[in-house]
Amino acid sequence: MEQPRKAVVVTGFGPFGEHAVNASWIAVQELEKLGLGDSVDLHVYEIPVEYQTVQRLIPALWEKHSPQLVVHVGVSGMATTVTLEKCGHNKGYKGLDNCRFCPGSQCCVEDGPESIDSIIDMDAVCKRVTTLGLDVSVTISQDAGRYLCDFTYYTSLYRGRGRSAFVHVPPLGKPYNADQLGRALRAIIEEMLGVLEQAEGDISCCHQL
């Protein structure tokens, strides 16, 4: 019997500040060209760097697609590797967005937990991707930066009960080009899906014991 296709949503960000071309959206567009194989329905979206749009759009994407996984991709001017973020944070949002706005409460979800961890084992994903021998270095982080990246991640983790991931990429050419970032994203997301399936298989086995 044919397995149902999995829905995977991947987002990148639009321009902001010094990033007139946002490497995250370029990388996501490269991923879209490559695809994630016949068993995955890939849906990609460009997200404006605006808190209020994120608060409206992220829950809508979860509602529309009921995805197996949502992966958000953002650019970090400080990054020199492709970085897997373990968690999103609820408070500390003071930086103004493209609309010169920041939440009055400085938080994502009032009365929400301080932080939410992804249910994906990022250490395992990092190790698996590293063994593939890609020409891109992959590392782990627990601080997505308290700006729109972190805000988006927490919002998605909260709505998706942890079935979300965030990947930070460096600016284009520092040191990776668009093709390298797109291929790295594909490898990372394929490994994330593998780790998720393995974890769910383990849970299913435990329930049957």
UniProtKB/Swiss-Prot annotation:
CDD domains xref list: Peptidase_C15 (cd00501)
Reactions listed under catalytic activity: Release of an N-terminal pyroglutamyl group from a polypeptide, the second amino acid generally not being Pro
Active site per UniProt: E85, C149, H168
TM segment ranges: none
Disulfide links within the chain: none
Gene3D superfamilies cross-referenced by the UniProt entry: Peptidase C15, pyroglutamyl peptidase I-like (3.40.630.20)
Compartments reported by the entry: Cytoplasm
Gene Ontology annotations for the cellular component aspect, listed alphabetically: cytosol
GO MF annotation list: peptidase activity; pyroglutamyl-peptidase activity
Keyword Aminoacyl-tRNA synthetase in record: no
Main enzyme class: hydrolase
Documented EC number(s): 3.4.19.3
Keyword list, A-Z: Cytoplasm, Hydrolase, Protease, Thiol protease
UniProt record, GO biological process: protein catabolic process; proteolysis
Family from the record: Belongs to the peptidase C15 family.
Biological function: Removes 5-oxoproline from various penultimate amino acid residues except L-proline.
Subunit description: Monomer.
Name this polypeptide is given: Pyroglutamyl-peptidase 1
This protein's encoding gene: Pgpep1
